[in-house]
Structure formats: C-alpha cells, structure tokens
Amino acid sequence: QGVENLIDFCMNHQLSMTNLLLLGIRTYLSKVNNGQEDITIQNFISRRSTHDEWTSGGSRTIMFPCRTVITPETDFLSAAYEIQNMQNRIYMHSNYDPAFIMDEMRKRYNTPEHTGYESCYLTYQPMTVKVENEMLGTIRQHAKWFANGAATKKMYLTVSHTEDGGMNFSYHYQTAHLEEHDMELLYYYMMRILFKGIAEPDMSIGEIMELV
C-alpha cells in the first residue's frame, strides 16, 4: 500500500520516483546537518562499471551531482519540482565526459585526489523483476544484492522494484565511517519524510523535518 501511494503521488503530480527519493534523502541530510539548505547527492543515470564502458556507445555520463538549495519555507511539492527542474536541465548535458565532471567537481570543491565532495549516491531501477514469457511465468524469481566488500562510495543506495510491486532498498556503505544503524536511521526518516510529504504536500520542508 505504501509503495502504491508513492507511485500514485508521482503519477498525479507528474514526478519521477527518482526525484521523490532524492527529496527524501536530501531532507534527511538537511535535518541531521542543522537545517543545511545546500545539499548535493550524486544521482546515477547510466550504470557503467569500467572506464572503457564509460565511453562505449557514446560518452553519456554515469552520474551527475544533484545540487539543490531548498529553504525550510518551501512546501514539499514545490521542493520536488525544484529537484525535477534541476534534473531536467542537467539531462540536456548528459553526454558530458564523466571524467570532465569529476575534474570540475574536484576544482570547485578543492577535494583531495581520489576523494569526492558528495557522500550519498542514488540509483533507481524502475524495472520490476517479472517474467513476461508465458512459458516461464510459473517460475518464481528471487534476486538479492550482495556487497563484494569494495565500497567505493561512502553511502550508495540502490532502489529497485520487487515482483509483487514492492520496493527494495539496498545500501552499500564504507564501514570505516558508517554502520548498519546509520542505514536504518536513513531509511526510517526517509520513509517518514516521504509519507508525510505526500499526505500533506503543502506542508513546508521545515515543518516536516520538525515533525519527523
């Protein structure tokens, strides 16, 4: 029921689920950072594993920094549209070389070599795990993520859909700085923020942060 409510909200307001998730994450980060308004999250748009794959079939970037400055007075729905508008502007430049974007971020924020400015990364996979072939339709499927221990990002969240229409949240994180409890807190508050926001989209981000 909860997932259906999120999807219905996106459909009714012409929003993508990615942007709703980004809003949930950035609001949580703002809450735990004394109301910080300037939040940046890396959003994956084309997953490619190796450097060679970065430029195969073109040089479409694998991810982009989703930076938004949202004041506490901004209502939930307007904040979601701010993220969506920013993302639409970025998508026009999705053919940028990934290395160029990383270099630009390094110059802008003076980050040391082999480090990054952003600590949170998001991938949303809208495809459900379901077999369309009638001959195979009775075969049940189950997929599960397993970390290989090489967490190159401080916190990397992959959100996908299950066969029954639910959503699966897979967290990969660097254990030197984070632990499972941190992921539980992120999930708990992100869900409270999102469900409060879709129930009362006219409520301000500041009010939502106080209530949750």
Which functions belong to the PLM regions below?
Residues 22, 26, 84, 88, ...:
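Generic solvent-exposed, charged/amphipathic alpha-helical segments
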Residues 10-18, 22, 32-142, 175-176, ...:
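His-Asp-centered acyl/peptidyl-transfer active-site segments
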Residues 1-4:
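DNA breakage-rejoining catalytic core of tyrosine-based enzymes
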